[in-house]
Amino acid sequence: MAKQIQAIRGMNDILPTQSPLWQKVEAVLRASVAAYGYSEIRTPIVENTDLFKRSIGEVTDIVEKEMYTFEDRNGDSLTLRPEGTASTVRAGNEHGLLYNQEQRLWYMGPMFRHERPQKGRYRQFHQFGVEVYGIGSADIDAEVLMLSARLWEKLGISEHVTLELNTLGDPAERAAYREALIAFLEQHKDKLDEDSQRRMYSNPLRVLDSKDPQVQSILADAPALMDYLGEESSQHFAQLRELLDAVGIQYRVNPRLVRGLDYYNRTVFEWVTNSLGSQGTVLAGGRYDGLVAQLGGKDTPAVGFAMGLERIVLLLETLELTQDIPAAVDVYVAAMGDSCLVEAIKVAQELRSTLPTLRVMSHCGGGNFKKQIKRADKSGAQVALLIGEEELAEGVVTVKYLRNDNEQQRVARNALSAFLAELTK
């Protein structure tokens, strides 16, 4: 017997029993961005490696340790995309979408990072993201946060997530703070863990994101970035909070929130949950006004967020909010005998035409009555439509209820569509 080939570690199949929940989440995401007037953009899975080195930053875990990078036959270094923002900016620059324009975009698709697989964190994962270009004011920051809050409302998890908010200021303010932070960290260098010592000079703000308890206790006395903000950055952050207060979105200012990517400035945020253990961040984003120019375009303000769908699905399962996921089939059509097969197929086709949202499965492969009913029940359908010689002669269909104790009944062929429309609405 030939050896079975398994999926690559950390890259998972989404099976038919799981896909309805994914489809529900995806439908909520699509409907929510449509309500705000955002347009979809689709970019390639493979990009030039330099795109991510220049955008994410060379001294980041993603670039240093996690990217799937390889050389093609021409010797060019290519990478499976680890996130969606850099590709969106690259596409915007390449196709002239960003200069002197406003764009509200969204994307959804697989991303790849070579990290240790664990619940809610995989090597291939699916990311949904929102990107806005050409608007530099705080009201658009508020809009993307309102959009994110709408997602939780529509998914029924608003009570289980919390918004954390911070500002990183502009590059000049951050540079001044960077020097102050380095000076502080140098005083405690011997107590820092290896990662923090490595980042202390190359990317000191990332030390603020350390999970090491000893480092966190040291940082309690670190200088605060808020003290280094100029008037414009302070006003931007104050206006954002005022707008969030006005629409009733609750948040917590977290001065240690810096995000893991180098390109953020001013507003940064995370939605977090206590229901997933260590994988508590379910959505994250912020403002990245310098990224478009950094990747070869003109200076363009930008803000957005991204979320991993695996983590959202896991959260819904953890909270046991998957009960209302419908079965893949509404109606199962069975022919009671070979002489009725043609009629059964015609009935199924007519229903698909007259009731396009009705999910109709036809029994194929023959078998006796017991076998067909067993298949109908397993399909998850509400009812089975039985067509035998007697039904054929009388121009009726027998409706057998599969999810309750209602007695089966006969329905005239010419009234079947109206009957099922009422039954399944």
UniProtKB/Swiss-Prot annotation:
Biological process terms in GO annotation: histidyl-tRNA aminoacylation
Class in the EC hierarchy, top level: ligase
Keyword Zinc-finger appears in the UniProt entry: no
EC number(s) stated in the UniProt entry for this protein: 6.1.1.21
GO cellular component term of the entry, any: cytoplasm
Catalysed reactions, semicolon-separated: tRNA(His) + L-histidine + ATP = L-histidyl-tRNA(His) + AMP + diphosphate + H(+)
GO MF assignments: ATP binding; histidine-tRNA ligase activity
Entry keywords, A to Z: Aminoacyl-tRNA synthetase, ATP-binding, Cytoplasm, Ligase, Nucleotide-binding, Protein biosynthesis
CDD domains for the chain: HisRS-like_core (cd00773), HisRS_anticodon (cd00859)
Official protein name in the record: Histidine--tRNA ligase
UniProt organism field: Shewanella sp. (strain ANA-3)
